[in-house]
Structures are given as C-alpha cells and as structure tokens.
C-alpha cells in the first residue's frame, strides 16, 4: 500500500506552512547534455524554440507583477471604503467620547498607510487589524449596526474582501504555474540562463493564522 488509512493520526493534526525561500533551478549534467544535443541535431532550429520559451517566461513574470498589483488595488479600495465609512459614522450622536477618540485614531492609522510601498501581506494584515478593532467598537451600539448606512458599508466591505481573496487566488495560481514551469526539463535550462528563481506565493501573517478564541463569549 502506498498510503495506509489505518495509520494512527497525530493528535495535534497538521497545518502546512508556506516555504518562500529562494530555490534556483539547477539542471543536471544529463539535462544540459540533451539540451545542447537538441541544438546540434536540429541544426539551430531549436534556437527559435528556446527564444519562444524565454519570451514566455518573461510574459509570465509580467503577469505575476500585474496579479500582485491587483491585490494592492483591492486592498486600497477596501481601505478607502473603511475611511469613508468612518467619516460617515463619526457624527453618530450616541458615541461616547472614548469611542469617538478611538475611531478617529483608527482613521488616522488607515490614512497613514502607504499602499504603494507596503507589501500585500503587510497591507492586508494592517487593514484587517484596524477593521477588527473598529467592529469591536461598533458592537457597543446595536442600533447603529442596524442602520441602513452601516449595513450598506458592511456589505461593500465584504464585497471588497471577496475581491481581495479572488485576487490572491489568482496571484497564487499564476505564481505556482511559473514555479512549476522553471523546474521542468528543458525550461530549467532556460531559467538558469535567465537567472530566474521561484516566486513567493501569498503567505498569511502569524496573527491571521491564530485560531479565534470565542471562550469569553460563553461566560
């Protein structure tokens, strides 16, 4: 049996980690031999195939850049919606001074985030943190949460989050395809010539991977 389903399972379970360490494609001596042999046997015709694969890898890198940019654009949009939400709700008459002060503080933090210079992972982590803190403040005002304006913003933010996850999945798909391609023969020979290496896939921050503790809600 290749796999035995009767094997005892670890009580701790298993959570896979993302390995984004750089790994350059290194063709074996045999692969290099056949690569050169193809050139000789095809009397240089293989060169045009080589150029085609080289251009393909260049296009792939541009697609990865574009996919990464789409993640940042989606996060930028969610940030803008959150700021607009706080600006619209900050005049809520029943807010206590402490709550109002915290909301103003969160808005300032959002405004100070440099979307263009912050990595997608860090950007998502910062905005998630602020949104979580904001939701905690709004929990104290059930009548506000039931208002049409609040529900409208919440729906829009949820839509933006769905778009973010979609752009992340798209990025990972393109990056994984590129990573698989540069390690297969004979593309690995081309990749080595171009000094290419694996592209990092999206990795959740340590805080985002922590299980949500709901024990306090039962007390």
Swiss-Prot record:
Location in the cell: Cell membrane
Cellular component, GO annotation: plasma membrane
UniProt keyword terms in alphabetical order: Cell membrane, Coiled coil, Membrane, Transmembrane, Transmembrane helix
Keyword Membrane attributed: yes
Coiled-coil stretches: 54-82
InterPro entries from the UniProt entry: LemA-like_dom_sf, MamQ_LemA
Keyword Iron tagged: no
Transmembrane segments: 32-52
SUPFAM superfamilies hit by this protein: LemA-like (SSF140478)
Topology with respect to the bilayer: Single-pass membrane protein
Family note: Belongs to the LemA family.
Official protein name in the record: Protein LemA
Provenance organism: Metamycoplasma hominis (strain ATCC 23114 / DSM 25592 / NBRC 14850 / NCTC 10111 / PG21) (Mycoplasma hominis)
Lineage of producing organism: Bacteria, Bacillati, Mycoplasmatota, Mycoplasmoidales, Metamycoplasmataceae
Gene field: lemA
């Amino acid at each position: 049996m290749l796999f035995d389903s009767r094997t005892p399972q670890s009580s701790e379970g298993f959570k896979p980690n993302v390995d984004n360490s750089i790994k350059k494609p290194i063709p074996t001596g045999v692969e290099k031999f056949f690569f050169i042999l193809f050139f000789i046997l095809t009397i240089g015709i293989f060169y045009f195939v080589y150029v085609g694969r080289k251009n393909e890898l260049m296009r792939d890198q541009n697609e990865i850049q574009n996919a990464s940019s789409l993640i940042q654009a989606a996060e930028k949009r969610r940030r803008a919606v959150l700021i607009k939400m706080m600006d619209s709700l900050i005049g809520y008459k029943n807010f206590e001074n402490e709550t109002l002060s915290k909301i103003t503080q969160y808005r300032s933090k959002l405004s100070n985030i440099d979307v263009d210079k912050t990595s997608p992972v860090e950007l998502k982590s910062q905005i998630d943190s602020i949104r979580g803190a904001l939701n905690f403040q709004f929990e104290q005002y059930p009548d506000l949460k039931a208002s049409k304006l609040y529900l409208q913003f919440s729906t829009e933010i949820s839509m933006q989050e769905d778009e973010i996850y979609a752009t992340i999945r798209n990025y990972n798909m393109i990056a994984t395809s590129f990573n698989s391609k540069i390690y297969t023969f004979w593309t690995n020979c081309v990749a080595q010539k171009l000094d290419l290496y694996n592209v990092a896939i999206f990795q959740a921050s340590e805080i985002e991977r922590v299980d949500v503790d709901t024990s306090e809600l039962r007390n």
